[in-house]
């Protein structure tokens, strides 16, 4: 089947694949055609992000489908966006969560659940005040300082 891949800004390309191909394979083909490294690509189908380890058939992607391509800046990690992407430990958590969700949900439902969890996590981080961050930093940097007067932080 032929898929059309359209970057948000730029020229679209067509790739020949089977429905059993993994998303990562599609990214490799797009990389060859558009000279965009796979780790900078985020493919979307009907507004939903596609996970590299899933097959096109998992998302019911058929012939003549159109995928949107978002190109990430060179330094940004793949997998999650925003603040979570800058921390490799958090990236590992999302990968582990993805594996667990895949065991209990359909690929589409697992993607929805994970997407909502990531949004909730990032919203929680954005809502932290500077005082919250300072308290957290003191507790992390001085875990054994129970005798230390930190009342000024509360």
UniProtKB/Swiss-Prot annotation:
<dbReference type="GO" id="GO:0005634">
    <property type="term" value="C:nucleus"/>
</dbReference>
<keyword id="KW-0813">Transport</keyword>
<keyword id="KW-0539">Nucleus</keyword>
<dbReference type="Pfam" id="PF00240">
    <property type="entry name" value="ubiquitin"/>
</dbReference>
<dbReference type="GO" id="GO:0071816">
    <property type="term" value="P:tail-anchored membrane protein insertion into ER membrane"/>
</dbReference>
<dbReference type="Pfam" id="PF17840">
    <property type="entry name" value="Tugs"/>
</dbReference>
<dbReference type="InterPro" id="IPR000626">
    <property type="entry name" value="Ubiquitin-like_dom"/>
</dbReference>
<dbReference type="GO" id="GO:0006620">
    <property type="term" value="P:post-translational protein targeting to endoplasmic reticulum membrane"/>
</dbReference>
<feature type="domain" description="Ubiquitin-like">
    <location>
        <begin position="1"/>
        <end position="76"/>
    </location>
</feature>
<dbReference type="InterPro" id="IPR019954">
    <property type="entry name" value="Ubiquitin_CS"/>
</dbReference>
<protein>
    <recommendedName>
        <fullName>Ubiquitin-like protein 4A</fullName>
    </recommendedName>
</protein>
<dbReference type="InterPro" id="IPR029071">
    <property type="entry name" value="Ubiquitin-like_domsf"/>
</dbReference>
<dbReference type="GO" id="GO:0005829">
    <property type="term" value="C:cytosol"/>
</dbReference>
<dbReference type="InterPro" id="IPR047154">
    <property type="entry name" value="UBL4A-like"/>
</dbReference>
<comment type="function">
    <text>As part of a cytosolic protein quality control complex, the bag6/bat3 complex, maintains misfolded and hydrophobic patches-containing proteins in a soluble state and participates in their proper delivery to the endoplasmic reticulum or alternatively can promote their sorting to the proteasome where they undergo degradation. The bag6/bat3 complex is involved in the post-translational delivery of tail-anchored/type II transmembrane proteins to the endoplasmic reticulum membrane.</text>
</comment>
<dbReference type="GO" id="GO:0071818">
    <property type="term" value="C:BAT3 complex"/>
</dbReference>
<dbReference type="GO" id="GO:0051087">
    <property type="term" value="F:protein-folding chaperone binding"/>
</dbReference>
<dbReference type="InterPro" id="IPR019956">
    <property type="entry name" value="Ubiquitin_dom"/>
</dbReference>
<dbReference type="InterPro" id="IPR041421">
    <property type="entry name" value="Ubl4_C_TUGS"/>
</dbReference>
<comment type="subunit">
    <text>Component of the bag6/bat3 complex.</text>
</comment>
<keyword id="KW-0963">Cytoplasm</keyword>
<dbReference type="InterPro" id="IPR044724">
    <property type="entry name" value="Ubl_UBL4A-like"/>
</dbReference>
């Amino acid at each position: 089947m032929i898929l059309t891949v359209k970057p948000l800004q730029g020229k679209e390309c067509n790739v020949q694949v089977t429905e059993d191909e993994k998303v990562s394979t599609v990214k490799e083909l797009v990389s060859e055609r558009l000279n965009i490294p796979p780790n900078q690509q985020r493919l979307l189908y009907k507004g939903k992000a596609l996970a590299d380890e899933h097959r096109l058939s998992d998302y019911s992607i058929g012939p003549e489908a159109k995928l949107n391509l978002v190109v990430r800046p060179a330094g940004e990690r793949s997998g999650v966006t925003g603040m979570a992407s800058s921390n490799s430990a958090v990236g590992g958590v999302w990968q582990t969560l993805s594996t667990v969700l895949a065991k209990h949900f359909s690929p589409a439902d697992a993607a929805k659940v994970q997407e909502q969890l990531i949004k909730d996590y990032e919203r929680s981080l954005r809502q932290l005040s500077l005082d919250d961050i300072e308290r957290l930093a003191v507790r992390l940097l001085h875990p054994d300082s129970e005798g230390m007067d930190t009342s000024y932080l509360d």
